[in-house]
Amino acid sequence: MNVVEFGIVMEASPGYTARLARDIEQLGFDVLLCPDTQNLSPDPFSQLALAAQTTTRLKLGTGVTNPVTRDVAVTACALATLQAESNGRVICGIGRGDSSAAHIGIRNGTTAQLKTFVQRLQAYTRGETVDRDGTPSRLRWFDSLQPPPVVVDVAATGPQTIRMAVDVGDRVSFAVGSAPERIRWAMDVALERLRETGRPRDSLSIGAYVNLVCDPDEQRAIDLGRMISGMVAHFAGMKDAPLDHLPPQLKSLAAHMQSGYDMKHHAQESGSHLQAVPDEFVDWFSICGPPVKCRQRLQELLDMGLDHVYQLGGSPVAHPHGARQAAMVEQARLYATEVIPHFR
């Protein structure tokens, strides 16, 4: 039986991250990922270093960083440092960039930029020398500590990025929602690319960011899942993204998000774009409801061969920031105790 890793995405929050990481580990999660989006949430690297001190087995990483707001050497240095501090528990979740780029007025990275960034990051965190336009560049301090190479997990929404992730990533995580047909489509793209390149299936961990809110009250779960559903639908409809491959339920909303997404309220329940996200879409695109429903819906996805799932959950507390994260972890308790053990 395939051993599935279960992770959770939580924004880092000073004064809370270390304690919540310990709670997350005790709940049975395998991975904690913190977004690297400087205008919307505190710095993940310093907070994850603190989390490394309160945990022993929990894998720690970014969910996600990007190729445009930090130079690759800077990101590699931070990750390799965390790798040494955590005794080799680091995962670098990375995508093309979205809110992190938008809030400083720059474009998100292209798939080609992301590929180059990933390859250079892998080289830096192996202690290798990287050619930076004719300048030999390496982490000179690396030899004295020699931390293990950092696992790079590429977040992918469209077909081009999925194929690139299969080519160069250590892991690939689909960000396509939780509807079975969306995961099946993404998995088919990844498996086809594996066949084309001859890369062994067992050399790549394939997973997904899963929009999931477990709550005895299904309507409450749907309400809490609306923000995540709108955000991930926006990923499918990013500027200039192809829409032809999307199913009808998603295509019209993704097209709306290309011009109607409220980036000022990204990842917030107050986003004006959420008025365009009906209950029926949330229920299809996310897993929202009591434990029995969550187990059934998640089983469908795992039966497709996913090796890991990262929960994108909801919080019943909007602010302040730390209390919001604490409430999100508490909201995940039912999922951790009544759903995850079913798959162990």
What residues fall within each predicted segment?
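Conserved, mostly hydrophobic/aromatic
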Residues: 28, 51, 82, 121, ...
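An alpha-helical appendage that flanks or caps ligand/catalytic pockets
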Residues: 107-143, 183-303
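Short, acidic/polar
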Residues: 13-24, 78, 156-164, 291-300
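Alpha-helix-loop-beta-strand connector modules within alpha/beta enzyme cores
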Residues: 45-65, 69, 124, 330-344
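Hydrophobic faces of well-ordered beta-strands that scaffold small-molecule active sites
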Residues: 4-10, 32-34, 60-63, 90-94, ...
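Glycine-rich, proline-tolerant flexible connector loops at the mouths of alpha/beta enzymes
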Residues: 31-54, 66, 98-101, 176-180, ...
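N-terminal beta1-alpha1-beta2 module of alpha/beta enzyme domains
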Residues: 1-62, 150
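Active-site mouth loops of central-metabolism enzymes
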Residues: 3-15, 65-72, 146-157, 212-215, ...
